[in-house]
Every structure is written in structure tokens, then in C-alpha cells.
């Protein structure tokens, strides 16, 4: 059971990744971003998730450097994720995109690098690039994002190395049970983006009722639900009190009955694009 903020999941290659991290989607470059990353690290977060398309890797890198200094830790204590964008999928293109991300972040290796979306006809060559970088020790773990079962099956017909992570949209309205079961059977660790459904679930009466029982916020209930399902979670926030509150989910446990009540909210409802039908 996940008992503290720095508890880690062990990926199928033996690399350990924190169960809990900070997401920075839709946070623009600037002092707010730098402070959010630094604040999270100072408050004990050890995992930061960004992506090339977010356009904020430089600020994330600055926040990492400031956070390391203020928290008195080393780079090796952190787990940093970025993702290659669709326009850069391809063997040489992906290798080049990785160098660009690394340079913007100001790092000499990444802990996790993901293919952001399953662009048909492109992701196998991109995966080959990730395998190369992994074998060279430039990345500690490699994975995918927004891949459905059929994408994973197709990728693995050509892959030498199985993805360690599949990061997908996951929240009480989109529980992706079949995909989770498939990934668990394959030894692919699931990770949730947009775990709070971009704030749309924070007024939900069932969740509010459960939150009252535990004297916790709705956000804390949802994030705890992620962890009890064995899913890594990376909620986004730039506000210090929220960064602290989101991470305060290790001093209680949801009953099986409450887990079931939350599971029952599923409507297969997405806030993000459908991985089988996107055009970017």
C-alpha cells in the first residue's frame, strides 16, 4: 500500500517511480511555473511530469534546479518525465526531439520518456528511437501515453522492449477497466493524467458525500482512489496550498464499499481527445 509521498512503484525493468507527482499541463513559462515545481519539490514531491508540446520544459528545468537547492537533495532523488510530440515521431526525428527536451530542461538524462499520442504509422519508428536512448542509458524508463489495447498490441509486434508505462486519461468518469486489466497482465504500469477531470468532478455529490465521511477534500478522495487502484497519479496545481493538500492522501484508506461507489460513477466520458479519433 502507498503509505507516503515518496513511496514508489517498481516498473517491469526494476526502475522505481514515485506513485505521486506534479503535472504541469497548461502551465505557461514564467515565475508561476518555476515556483510550482520548486514548491512541490520542497514539499516532498519527487516526480515532475512535462511534455514538449506544453512549451514549458525550460521553466520546469529552472524549478527543478531551484527545488533541488532549496530542498537539499540531488538530481538522482527526482523522477522527471517528458514526452515526444506527434510532429516529431520517427526514428531520427524522435532522437532529435529528445535532445531538444533534455537541453531545455537542463538535464543530462530523463527518468521517463513517453510517446505522447499513438499516431498511426509513426509510433513504431519513434519507439525504436526510445529503445536506442534507453539502451544508451539516456533514459531510465520508456513508455507511451494515450495508447489503447490495440495500439499496444500493434506496437509490441515490432518492439524489442515492452513499454514500462502507459499514461492515459483516468478519473471516476473514465475508469478504463479493460485497458487497466490488459496493462496489469502485461506488466505495464498505468499512470493517470487529468485525474481530477480538470476540476469538473470537484462538486460531484457522491464524491462530496464520501469526502465528508473522511474529512477530506473531493480531490484527495479521487487521488486516493487512484492510488488504491494501483495507478500512478500526477495532479496539476500551481497554488502552494493545493500542492500540499493534493499530496495529503497517505493518512487514510478508502473502504472497498467507497471504492465501489466511485467506480460506479464511470460513464466512459473524456475531457481529452479520443485516442482512436484525433487529428493533431
Swiss-Prot record:
CDD domains: AKR_AKR5G1-3
Site annotation Lowers pKa of active site Tyr: residues: 83
Record bears the keyword NADP: yes
PROSITE patterns: ALDOKETO_REDUCTASE_1 (PS00798), ALDOKETO_REDUCTASE_2 (PS00062), ALDOKETO_REDUCTASE_3 (PS00063)
Binding positions for substrate per the UniProt entry: 116
Residues at the active site: 54
Keywords associated with the record: NADP, Oxidoreductase
A Pfam family hit: Aldo_ket_red
Protein residues bound to NADP(+): 194-246
Enzyme Commission designation: 1.-.-.-
Keyword NADP: yes
GO molecular function, one term: aldo-keto reductase (NADPH) activity
Taxonomy, superkingdom: Bacteria
Family per similarity comment: Belongs to the aldo/keto reductase family.
Protein name as it appears in the record: Uncharacterized oxidoreductase YtbE
Gene that encodes it: ytbE
Amino acid at each position: 500500500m502507498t503509505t507516503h509521498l515518496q513511496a514508489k512503484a517498481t516498473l517491469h525493468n526494476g526502475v522505481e517511480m514515485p506513485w505521486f507527482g506534479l503535472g504541469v499541463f497548461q502551465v505557461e513559462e514564467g515565475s508561476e511555473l518555476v515556483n510550482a515545481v520548486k514548491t512541490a519539490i520542497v514539499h516532498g514531491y519527487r516526480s515532475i511530469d512535462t511534455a514538449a508540446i506544453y512549451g514549458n520544459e525550460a521553466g520546469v528545468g529552472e524549478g527543478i534546479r531551484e527545488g533541488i537547492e532549496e530542498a537539499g537533495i540531488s538530481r538522482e532523488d527526482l523522477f522527471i518525465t517528458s514526452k515526444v510530440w506527434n510532429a516529431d515521431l520517427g526514428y531520427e526525428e524522435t532522437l532529435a526531439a529528445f535532445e531538444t527536451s533534455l537541453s531545455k530542461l537542463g538535464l543530462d538524462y530523463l527518468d521517463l520518456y513517453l510517446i505522447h499520442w499513438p499516431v498511426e504509422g509513426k509510433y513504431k519508428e519513434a519507439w525504436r528511437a526510445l529503445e536506442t536512448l534507453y539502451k544508451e542509458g539516456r533514459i531510465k524508463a520508456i513508455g507511451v501515453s494515450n495508447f489503447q489495447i490495440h495500439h499496444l498490441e500493434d506496437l509490441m509486434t515490432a518492439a524489442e522492449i515492452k513499454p514500462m508505462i502507459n499514461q492515459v486519461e483516468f478519473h471516476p468518469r473514465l475508469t478504463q477497466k479493460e485497458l487497466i486489466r490488459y496493462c496489469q497482465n502485461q506488466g505495464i504500469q498505468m499512470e493517470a493524467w487529468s485525474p481530477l477531470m480538470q476540476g469538473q468532478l470537484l462538486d460531484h455529490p457522491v464524491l462530496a458525500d464520501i469526502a465528508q465521511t473522511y474529512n477530506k477534500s473531493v480531490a484527495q478522495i479521487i487521488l486516493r482512489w487512484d492510488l488504491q487502484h494501483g495507478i500512478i497519479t500526477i495532479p496539476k496545481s500551481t497554488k502552494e496550498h493545493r500542492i500540499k493538500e493534493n499530496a495529503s492522501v497517505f493518512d487514510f484508506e478508502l473502504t472497498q464499499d467507497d471504492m465501489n461507489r466511485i467506480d460506479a460513477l464511470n460513464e466512459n466520458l473524456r475531457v481529452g481527445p479520443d485516442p482512436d479519433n484525433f487529428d493533431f
